[in-house]
Amino acid sequence: MTLDAFTAFCKSLAHSTYVCQWGGSHVWKIGGKVYVIAGDSGGVMDRVSFKVTPIAFDFLKSQPGCQGAPHLASRGMKWIQRTTDEAMSDAELLTYIRDSYRLVAAGLTKKLQKELGLAATELPPKAARR
């Protein structure tokens, strides 16, 4: 996936904000909370980390081209890092990024969700967020 395609997708998610931090990582947030972190090499994404459900974490961490996200999964958080495209297509990656956005948005305070205009029907059920 190109950096331009990744950026366009993240920009399309309501209230997403961008910051370049941690040594040049492309970090996208909702309500001030990170939902995806990516690195690129020459405009091509070479690693992408995103939040997942516990079931997706257990499945993806054993797939070629995926691992628990460094500095996040080691703290018990359910974050996966895709290091190559052999584990999933770009379309599947975008689905996981959208799911990560929804999981992080669901964890925001009710007040902030309301301020951002996030409808409860757009967010995953509480049980799926753990």
Where is each model-derived feature located?
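Charge-dense, helix-prone N-terminal extensions
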Residues: 1-130
